[in-house]
């Protein structure tokens, strides 16, 4: 009889994408030997996934595993990766080795989801290559942010490139604008965001949920390529080997400053906020105030607009696009 497992994790959506790799790896390594369900904060990530079977934690035959990734605690000094950290933990929990799954495309879409027009098609009445742009950050967690003004400069520098700005309404996002930008902040639920990424040519963001979706969601056939363009403005908060995904342009400054000379600093905020939160005890060692008054970590300021523009241009110059696919 297959063993019944419920994987429990109540962290952020990006963490759940990494947990999904562990779930996929388990089934690929031991096909037919496990029946699995999840207890998570964002259940919609697992919709359309054939590996999910509804189970009850009250069933005595069900084992509930609280999913963690303790390898993060040694990620500055060991060659651990976020994508396989949950897998290593799950292997320890079941007492069996698990071979990591294919690195990309583990979030399936239903046939009906693939068949719908993209959100950009609804706006422009045609399909175009576009980039999903996440320029925001969590309201209480600011250390991952790039300059909001530079995001606007990026949009302005690429007038022939279409962008769709996304993000959760409860987070902090700049009000970007331009004839080449469609603003959809607060207008997508999880499945809508997945479909938006599915139909996109690329994703530009900080270290975030959309960054993980860029390679976890399959590439659309119209782009005639097996991976999605993925540019992340990362700085030096995390060790680059920990976060970087497949075919991923991960713009980091690890090793360039004393505060991230060996791995990431893992700080929470750029400067203290007036909320008495414990995150005020984890502050950037090199905060810089931009001309508009925004505080940004120096490791992020070191990444110029032109660094991102050149990568976007390189991708677009090699675009092989078939809108009818």
List the predicted regions and their residue ranges.
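Active-site and donor-binding regions of nucleotide-sugar-utilizing enzymes
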Residues: 1-87, 192-202, 210-216, 220-223
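Structural beta-sheet core signal
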Residues: 6-7, 38, 133, 165, ...
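Catalytic phosphate/metal-binding cores of nucleic-acid and nucleotide-processing enzymes, i.e., regions
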Residues: 7, 117-133, 187-188, 204, ...
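Residue-level signal for short, function-critical loop segments
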Residues: 11, 137-139, 236
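Donor-binding and catalytic core of enzymes assembling or modifying cell-surface/extracellular glycoconjugates
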Residues: 17-20, 143-242
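Nucleotide-sugar donor-binding patch of glycosyltransferase catalytic domains
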Residues: 215-324
